[in-house]
Amino acid sequence: MAEEEKPPVSESIEDNKDDKKRTIDKVDDSVEDGAEKKPEAAVKNDGETAEKPEKKHKKRRRRQYEDEVPKEKSEDEGEDEEDEDDDGDEINDELADLDDEDDDDLAEIDPANIIPSGRRTRGKVIDFTKAAEKLKEEGKIEDDEGEDGEYGEK
């Protein structure tokens, strides 16, 4: 009995193949009616459509334009704004030059400040009060408070 049941199963598989062929025939008939025709290479033997070929990746390019697009204005308005911007830039440049002059302190390094052992002091705790007392005893410390003419004068 088991052998008799197998042929009907195989017949049902063949029927499914016929159904798939019929659906393909219907697609071909619809093409004749004016619908778009699919290429035959895209249809597999089982009636399934083949996967589409992978799209080529386009090269990504950097944008060659600024994020903010300048607004179109009349010539008179644009000139006025440019003049105001130039004044602000000059002021900023002058302030930057003053800051640079303050940072250019090129006094010589006092050899007493160099550690004689040559070892690094990273991570060590330095007691500056003891060092200050030691230098006062030696008479090498000068009072910096008297030198500041900017704050003391009125």
From Swiss-Prot:
The keyword Nuclease does not apply. Keywords: Chaperone, Nucleus. Residues 1-118, 135-154 are annotated as: Disordered. The keyword Nucleus applies. It comes from the Eukaryota. GO terms for cellular component: nucleus. Residues 1-54, 64-74 have a biased composition (Basic and acidic residues). InterPro entries: Histone_chaperone_domain_CHZ. Its main location: nucleus. Residues 75-108, 140-154 have a biased composition (Acidic residues). It is found in: Nucleus. Forms a heterotrimer with H2A.Z-H2B, stabilizing the association of the histone dimer. Also, with a lower affinity, forms a heterotrimer with H2A-H2B. Belongs to the CHZ1 family. Forms a chaperone-bound H2A.Z-H2B complex that acts as a source for SWR1 complex-dependent H2A to H2A.Z histone replacement in chromatin. This is Histone H2A.Z-specific chaperone CHZ1. The lineage of its organism: Eukaryota, Fungi, Dikarya, Ascomycota, Saccharomycotina.
